Amino acid sequence: MEGVYSAEAVIDNGRFGTRTIRFETGRLARQATGSATAYLDDETMVLSATTVSKRPKEALDFFPLTVDVEERMYAAGRIPGSFFRREGRPSEDAILTCRLIDRPLRPSFQKGLRNEIQIVATVLALHPDHLYDVIAINAASMSTQLAGLPFSGPIGGVRVALVEGQWVAFPTHSELANATFDMVVAGRVLDNGDVAIMMVEAESTPHTLRLVAEGAIGPNEQTVAEGLEAAKPFIKVLCRAQQTVAEAAGKPPGEYPIFIDYQDDAYAAVEEAIHDELAAALTIADKQEREAELDRVKALVAEKLAEDFEGREKELAAAFRALTRKLVRERIVKDGVRIDGRGVKDIRSLTAEVNVIPRVHGSALFERGETQILGITTLNMLRMEQTIDTLNPERTKRYMHNYNFPPYSTGETGRVGAPKRREIGHGALAERALVPVLPSREEFPYAIRQVSEAIGSNGSTSMGSVCASTMSLMAAGVPLKDMVAGIAMGLIYEDGKYVTLTDILGAEDAYGDMDFKVAGTRDLITALQLDTKLDGIPAEVLASALQQARGARLAILDVMSEAINRPAEISPHAPRILTVKVPIDKIGEVIGPKGKMINSIQDETGAEITIEDDGTIYIGATDGPSAEAARDAINSIANPTMPEVGERYLGTVVKTTAFGAFVSLLPGKDGLLHISQIRKMHGGQRIENVEDVISIGEKIHVEVRDIDERGKLSLVPVEVIEAEAVAAPNGGESPNGAKKTDASGNGAKQPRRRRRTRSSSRSSENT
């Protein structure tokens, strides 16, 4: 087609086959500033459109970039499950993909750009075994590269998974089931041909610990470094294909005004006016005292320079920030001393405590310096797990991790309510760190909700959430396979020298060159997140940072272990859940016609019952006896002990007829009490209507007299048997007036078999 340009990137995964990523432009969304379509094996298709406002937002002091991901359910051949049957607010998967796109693209735009830029990636088609997020990264980069913006792309994004000892690019869901580590890496190609890693999002899989126990390669520090190197050739191929399309169809660079933060004279004036006061303020260890002094010094700038720089107040504020950044970095690189007086490898003071909130199922408080995280765990029936209506093949989510960041955590006012993208991203990171150590559904049949409350913040609340959540889960009785801790690392690069910082503060995050978060057990990395502002980080520097993070992680785990080192007993306030396995062909009997049987069991025991398609039944109740009563009732139906002749039961009359009454002995097992036996209960008198002497719901002790070849039960009242037994030795008469005799008619007493008495599980609950 005329005006349509395309290029392919072929990814060779050896014995795992090849993946073909095709970039195309000129066919769809032609009115956007830049548009591109990315295909994965011609089965998955993502359209990205980049648009730019005509005029800059001069009043803004930040870059107004917006990234949106639109999941269309038709991409998977489905209709949305909402009431209106159309897509609504973005799913968590879509929001996390927005963040994956934003993080490498935002620093690639020229600093000072103030035109609004919007990137919209729409998932148009999705193979059920594919993941669309990395395709969206490449599509967004391609459309932005074509738009003629001041953009230092292209950016290549690739997911690599460690499967059977090999790093596989663009793995499928089925391949990830056999992977021990999963990494999304984004970067760009430098002029020297090397690849600058700009963003990493990595995690162990739910199967990692099992696979490692079976002999697979575990995700340790060396493995992660190798994975980053393995991703670089794939990124090169992707960037080369994008560049081919951009050279053929890209718009010429447009003229966009660049707003610099300050002029040189403003910086020089600020430095001369308050250099010494600012340097002294930055040596104050306490955050609140330091910020109060910084506010005073900042006010001093306005006082001294306002007249000379009238109308340029924003420049003075920007120059003040730039000078602060310079002084913080100089002190770290030259003296090895940080803002709060620590060395580069020092961790702030740590505090760990469990059971800090009454009545909740599990709670913990983790403090690292001024960062303070509350972890709260709630357990419930599996039917309470989250139902997911997204393009992800997983339809339910058993472990739910929510992260809250209220404005008071930093001593500020602000909006509270629905979670922002940052909160969703931090919660997802903490969730990924913990999923590999969670017990399976079979081992622990509970839905688990974990909430992290960041009630105090000065750096790395997401990693603090991992620590607090680990302790909270163990306090709730969740049998974690191992304890997990997290640490945030930073990096300063000045004059060819790299300095790695352990346990960074919020200010060090803002003024540093890298934010590097690592979570894991003593032996394995379970989650990792990296964002860098540099063109690239040497492999040896990254490997050193990983080792430094491991030492800090082990120190934190030691403190956590002092608070709790093994799972506690499940809280008395948490529901008790039992599991019963029944044959699949018995599920219908347990449910009963129109749910009659299962509703009856739930009503009588107070338990909640969930039935899986494979015959697994989960029983939840507020106390153990109720759950056990429900389990006994289910077993009596699906795994019954058949009544035998001579056994006695406390039964319940469930039906009356002209010839007698049917008595329920066990759920689903009724027997006939013939009218002749009912007559004996009433002195042998004639009975016109059974309903006159016996009513539905009445309790009656009966004995199984006979079981015919069809399994039908004939019953006799225990009181009749006992009356006959008393009358027989004295030659007396039975209740119907006839003398009791043996088979020969001589009236001799016959030996009776030993009887056992049972009560029906349904009726015994009411006695």
UniProtKB/Swiss-Prot annotation:
InterPro entries: ExoRNase_PH_dom1 (IPR001247), ExoRNase_PH_dom2 (IPR015847), ExoRNase_PH_dom2_sf (IPR036345), GPSI/PNP (IPR014069), KH_dom (IPR004087), KH_dom_type_1 (IPR004088), KH_dom_type_1_sf (IPR036612), NA-bd_OB-fold (IPR012340). Its cofactor is Mg(2+). CDD domains: KH-I_PNPase (cd02393), RNase_PH_PNPase_2 (cd11364), S1_PNPase (cd04472). It is found in: Cytoplasm. It catalyses: RNA(n+1) + phosphate = RNA(n) + a ribonucleoside 5'-diphosphate. Pfam families: KH_1 (PF00013), PNPase (PF03726), RNase_PH (PF01138), RNase_PH_C (PF03725), S1 (PF00575). Keywords: Cytoplasm, Magnesium, Metal-binding, Nucleotidyltransferase, RNA-binding, Transferase. Its EC number is 2.7.7.8. GO terms for molecular function: 3'-5'-RNA exonuclease activity; magnesium ion binding; polyribonucleotide nucleotidyltransferase activity; RNA binding. Residues 575-634 form the KH domain. It comes from the Bacteria. Mg(2+) binds at residues 509, 515. GO terms for cellular component: cytosol. Residues 750-759 have a biased composition (Basic residues). Residues 646-718 form the S1 motif domain. One of its GO terms (biological process) is mRNA catabolic process. Residues 725-767 are annotated as: Disordered. Its main location: cytoplasm. Belongs to the polyribonucleotide nucleotidyltransferase family. Involved in mRNA degradation. Catalyzes the phosphorolysis of single-stranded polyribonucleotides processively in the 3'- to 5'-direction. This is Polyribonucleotide nucleotidyltransferase. It comes from Thermobifida fusca (strain YX). The lineage of its organism: Bacteria, Bacillati, Actinomycetota, Actinomycetes, Streptosporangiales.
